[in-house]
Amino acid sequence: MRAAESGADARVRPVDRVEPADAPAGDAGGLRAAVPGDGGSAVRPGDARLDVLVPPGLVDEPAAGALPGGGQRAPGAGRADGGDVRPVGGRDADGAPRFDQPVPPGGYLWWYVDAVSDDGRHGLTFIAFVGSVFSPYYAWAGGPKADRADPENHCALNIALYGDAGKRWTMTERGRRWMRRSRDEFVIGPSRLHWDGESLLVEFDEVGVPIPRRVKGRVRVWPKALCRFVTSLDSGGRHRWGPIAPCSRIEVELDSPRVRWSGHAYLDSNEGDEPIDRPFREWDWSRATMADSSTAVIYDVRQKRDGDRVIAERFLLDGSTESFEAPPRQPLPTTLWRIGRTMRTEPGVPALVEQTLEDTPFYARSMVRSGLLGEVVTSVHETMLLPRVITLPVRLMLPWRMPRRA
């Protein structure tokens, strides 16, 4: 976002859109102020357009009012057929974050925030997990198929700070007795996420590893609009993603390291009914803030057995969305851990890695310059290589970065 709107002036507007169900086929430089937003889009195998898939029964029904055929819906919970409605996408019916959504054994649900300061000198990401998908403890607890473990016994808040104040990273997994979830709040040990009806507050007091440096403070995310866009990432509809507040402002107050800043932010959620490595081989995801302060997202998913699924969506400031055709893939330089990244960019605008923020055996986060929708943009970009997550060497390394407090 480039306008410096004050969070107090934000007015949250829910957008009542969930994609319909259908059966699909088959490094240099610092942080840039022009960092992306994020969204979701039409799903395509390769580049052919497909309707987005949301599994039946997972979508919240409309509020009280007229029903097809002339009937009326009474206020309150439940479907027209008398059944229960399961929350989907880590959000409530109005699009606001909802933290008490059920998660099946072996499954996961996470809320993701990234942000960059207006001056481009600072950045951060937060990921709050129910069912810590990359955790070796969660996988080992789930038995031979890693699908029997209790997700609420494996929760974590991942914090990554970048920029002038130095780089810090924490991700301590905590057991059920350290966790509490309600509709508006998610508590993980000494940290919590809280939705107050207008903004998302994240308060945290964590310690990094292997160097034990404290990360303490609070941030507040002010959505410009709430979005109910949810789409499936896999052909079976067991893994879903959607932005909650793709165009937001953020206020950051850190006690350790001591720094204050404000900027533009993005909030989304991912969820799955099974371990994340089941259907996917890899994905590249990117979000960019456009010249009009809208957010464009490309989710480029490669499945193990079915075709590619490409989601390309532009999220406008009023909460509405516009699908677009993703430009061609371009290979990026491999990381130190030999992850082969790609970026979608328009012909004539070579993709350029401006900075690699995270370089791990299975995941890379970068700032990438590319051409998108007729503009030159800098995106927050990630590459995930799922087969590496389940290898024994990686699982034996992860406890050094992800300790557990049961």
UniProtKB/Swiss-Prot annotation:
Transmembrane portions of the chain: none
Catalytic activity: rhodopin = all-trans-lycopene + H2O; 1,1'-dihydroxy-1,1',2,2'-tetrahydrolycopene = rhodopin + H2O; 1-hydroxy-all-trans-1,2-dihydro-neurosporene = all-trans-neurosporene + H2O; 1,1'-dihydroxy-1,1',2,2'-tetrahydroneurosporene = 1-hydroxy-all-trans-1,2-dihydro-neurosporene + H2O
Gene Ontology CC, one term: plasma membrane
Family: Belongs to the CrtC hydratase family.
A GO molecular-function annotation: hydro-lyase activity
pH dependence per the entry: Optimum pH is 8. No activity is detected at pH 4.0-5.0. At higher pH values, it shows rapid decrease in activity, although 50% of the relative activity is still detected at pH 9.0. It retains much residual activity after 30 minutes incubation at pH 4.0-8.0, indicating that CrtC is stable in both slightly alkaline and acid environments.
Official protein name in the record: Acyclic carotenoid 1,2-hydratase
EC number: 4.2.1.131
Annotated region described as Disordered, given as residue ranges: 1-48, 61-101
Sequence ranges of Low complexity compositional bias: 21-34
Temperature note: Optimum temperature is 30 degrees Celsius. Enzyme activity is significantly lower at 20 degrees Celsius and 40 degrees Celsius.
Superkingdom, natural source: Bacteria
Ranges annotated as biased composition (Basic and acidic residues): 8-20, 81-97
